[in-house]
A protein has these predicted regions:
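Helix-coil boundary and interhelical linker segments in multi-pass alpha-helical membrane proteins
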Residues: 24-37, 170-173
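Structural signature of hydrophobic alpha-helical transmembrane segments
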Residues: 11-12, 34-46, 109-119
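Small-residue-rich segments of transmembrane alpha-helices in multi-pass membrane proteins
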Residues: 15-28, 70-83, 148
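Cytoplasmic-side transmembrane-helix entry/capping segments in multi-pass membrane proteins
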Residues: 8-18, 37-43, 64-74
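C-terminal transmembrane helix-loop-helix hairpin of multi-pass membrane proteins
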Residues: 102-173
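Alpha-helical membrane segments in multi-pass integral membrane proteins
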Residues: 66-127
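Short, small-residue-biased leader/transition segments that mark boundaries at the very start
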Residues: 1-6
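Hydrophobic alpha-helical transmembrane segments and adjacent interfacial helices
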Residues: 20-31, 49-55
Length: 173
């Protein structure tokens, strides 16, 4: 009983922290581009709804697709870390300024769109995890883990859509 109380408290603190961080990031985007938050939230909700309908119709993510998604996710994480390291070590180098210039143009929009597609496909994996958890009759603890994964997936999709909209808006200027 006591352990469950600590876990509940930790989850609440984590959720509040995540909410504040998400609000802070959204406010930064909102200061730069008017109306972008409403657009991002609307597109995120529409995407989740469409993906839920598609999943309910029987479309599934195969094992090869899951492997490709995880690979893409790891490549993007490692690439992002390398970019941050380059920005920290050599912010005025030709390589860094070239990457920034490319990232703010059409190629950056393309990569942002690919990020949205990866986030959407990962959401399909979350739907499958939830379905398998329920069908196999796993304990409620695993249902909570699966629902947590879904929430993280929706937040990730929102951030990717927000990034894509910002790149599109920035490219119009």
């Amino acid at each position: 009983q006591r352990q469950m109380c600590i876990r509940d408290r930790t989850g609440s603190i984590y959720s509040a922290g995540m909410g504040y961080a998400l609000t802070f990031m959204s406010m930064i985007y909102a200061m730069q581009w008017k109306g972008i938050i409403v657009e991002a939230v609307t597109l995120t909700l529409l995407t989740v709804a469409v993906l839920a309908v598609i999943y309910s119709k029987g479309v599934r993510v195969g094992s090869r697709m899951k492997t490709a998604l995880i690979t893409c996710l790891w490549v993007s994480i490692i690439g992002g870390l390398l970019f941050m390291l380059l920005a920290w070590l050599a912010p005025h180098s030709a390589i860094y300024t070239s990457i920034v210039a490319i990232n703010n143009g059409p190629i950056g929009i393309l990569f942002a769109a690919i990020g949205v597609l990866i986030a959407a496909a990962l959401l399909m994996c979350d739907f499958e995890t939830i379905q398998m958890t329920v069908e196999q009759g796993l304990p409620a603890q695993y249902e909570w883990y699966a629902s947590y994964g879904l929430i993280v997936g929706v937040i990730y999709l929102y951030l990717k859509i927000l990034n894509l909209l910002a790149k599109i808006a920035n490219n119009r200027k």
